[in-house]
């Protein structure tokens, strides 16, 4: 079972999704023109390793990739990792820890998450509290602490959508750090672009912002160096290649919630992870047989909807701070 831990550091932070001691099948799709990533080549379907042990999302721009080192070292102390010589032979285990970062250096003081911060976020993910309902914490937390979304403060958000496949229903949950260069609000109407997806996912109605009040908010991004990153988790037994397709399709949610999206100065990156009884398989076991095409279509649609709603969740629950406007504090449309 995937668990989540955050290290919130005032003006930046780290979020870790821990996939269990045997890991989980995963892949990634990178769409932004300025990504900051680690171990993404490994997750391409044609490469060897099938499973990851954790995924790290971090602030601090490229400096924040150091947080993954702390996660790796912490897991190594628990003898968790890819068995280099196989499960049945003694030898080193290498934790597989992909990561992606956002540019948040314009918020607060220049502060970089460290390996120690990554380890702290992992320890939080390993705690009993991390296995509570995973959609409860959102907004200004973890990797979303220093995020901005257009003219508003961004953050960390989550949303879950059911994929109604022909033979089985599966859950698809998106955990997103919303820090786009583009806007998340329609300046003419004051509505969040992803409001309908959020309302469908949560059952909660959202008020539109007052367009004049929103227009008066200064854009805090003197340099458009940003990024929306996240992880899509499903309980469907997808293969690594299908996880790649799921990550690719999930980017549609960014394109619907952010305008423009996938710009040359964004580093938009989405990981996809199959959370299917990871403890029942060995870390070097072959992947599952996968799902059929109609099921993949349902999973992809649900992933895009979940990503769209999670971005809105991040923005709606962002806390005031650093002189940034927030959805919660701006006047609403009459």
Describe the role of every protein-language-model region.
Residues 2-69, 73, 77-334:
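A structural signal for small-residue-enriched, beta-sheet-centric alpha/beta enzyme cores
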